[in-house]
Amino acid sequence: MIAGQPIFILKEGTKRESGKDAMKENIEAAIAISNSVRSSLGPRGMDKMLVDSLGDIVITNDGVTILKEMDVEHPAAKMMVEVSKTQDSFVGDGTTTAVIIAGGLLQQAQGLINQNVHPTVISEGYRMASEEAKRVIDEISTKIGADEKALLLKMAQTSLNSKSASVAKDKLAEISYEAVKSVAELRDGKYYVDFDNIQVVKKQGGAIDDTQLINGIIVDKEKVHPGMPDVVKDAKIALLDAPLEIKKPEFDTNLRIEDPSMIQKFLAQEENMLREMVDKIKSVGANVVITQKGIDDMAQHYLSRAGIYAVRRVKKSDMDKLAKATGASIVSTIDEISSSDLGTAERVEQVKVGEDYMTFVTGCKNPKAVSILVRGETEHVVDEMERSITDSLHVVASALEDGAYAAGGGATAAEIAFRLRSYAQKIGGRQQLAIEKFADAIEEIPRALAENAGLDPIDILLKLRAEHAKGNKTYGINVFTGEIEDMVKNGVIEPIRVGKQAIESATEAAIMILRIDDVIATKSSSSSSNPPKSGSSSESSED
């Protein structure tokens, strides 16, 4: 303020909050996001119905899907949405867990701030606790080999237990395991899984049990000509990034016809060029042609006469998967194709799925890509099935890549909380308070599991703490019986990556929000188009 006059540095209409008010608003917004998904955690969690502005409905209990579909405006709330997206990107599962932990950390931090503990001190304590928690997960984890199918299946089933797809969890877990094993690559003694090699195709109709794994690729296209064979055995597949049609010139052209016979010669030449293309494909031994481009009607006729199965306008991503599955090379020029460019498959056939026809390329001898055909009675069921299978695939892949697992059912969270309280006693200072609050926040996971199962969370937490104090580190909540049991014996296990990434993402988000003490929100562009009236006070300044 100069000579009693305030200095305005922000534009008119700009909203600003600072200090504890800004921090409180950010924390409350983040906690609101956490609470919105809390009731969807675990096998007894509830589903959410999300309706967009067009009236389209999504029914799911998948954390990241719920938050993606929500129209979130508050910046702190958007940061919580990013937590779930990060968890989904790196792990594929545990999105709800990550958001609940982040909300718990912020709720506990609010109490410390009210006791005049500085946010920087809280952040330091949280970071120390996060590192210790991840160390504890590594310490209590159990190694698993790629050949331990039973354990890998249990992990997939644990993931599916909390989904609508749990009714067919045994079959879907088997499909997830086989799909991941088919595309996993062993390099330097470690497995790597590229999810670009796993194609998930959903098709409404049929039952959930009709979902199947295809050792090859599903192309959502039918053959281009009815005269072509429906099935080709011992297929030799040509993949083309070139059209089987006469290329139109890039510039406008006019033909001057002086003699009617010239038209016939012109058409005959076009026909001859198309015949030569088909003859070239036939000469290298191909009996299946799949192209990203178009196929001329005349070329379709010649392909049909040659007994060649053809599909056109296939997506680039599907072409890449076909190349990996069949061993074919994608050829850009038909003149350059050779027999060495062809891929192989035991069978290529047109199959009716629901109301549509699709092309199945199956029986690839050493597939580097596989497909999962997801079926379900309604569109909503199929969509949720796709999300469930995707999570299950990521769980199996994470376990295979990391080679370790930990107990589920809140057991790992309870053990972390128990050990963090002991760890806090060794630290001292105000960071000790933050570490203890971190332990309380981690216990939000078993608390939420108990609440969603209709159990008394206080009784459950007391029993859980008592078991872990006895050294029963794998004891968690059986949400179906309400008892505290050994989760490993019950087959409720999860990859260590799920818990470690959830803690890391939640901690970073909580610290980022705690370090904000000033929120400046500019007015919307619509309001900025209306200039202030003459003589009105302005909060803007010239640069």
Swiss-Prot record:
One of its GO terms (molecular function) is ATP-dependent protein folding chaperone. It comes from the Archaea. The keyword Nucleotide-binding applies. Keywords: ATP-binding, Chaperone, Nucleotide-binding. Forms a Heterooligomeric complex of two stacked eight-membered rings. The N-terminus is blocked. Coiled coil: none annotated. Molecular chaperone; binds unfolded polypeptides in vitro, and has a weak ATPase activity. It holds the Pfam family Cpn60_TCP1. The keyword Nucleotide-binding applies. This is Thermosome subunit beta. Residues 522-543 are annotated as: Disordered. Residues 523-543 have a biased composition (Low complexity).
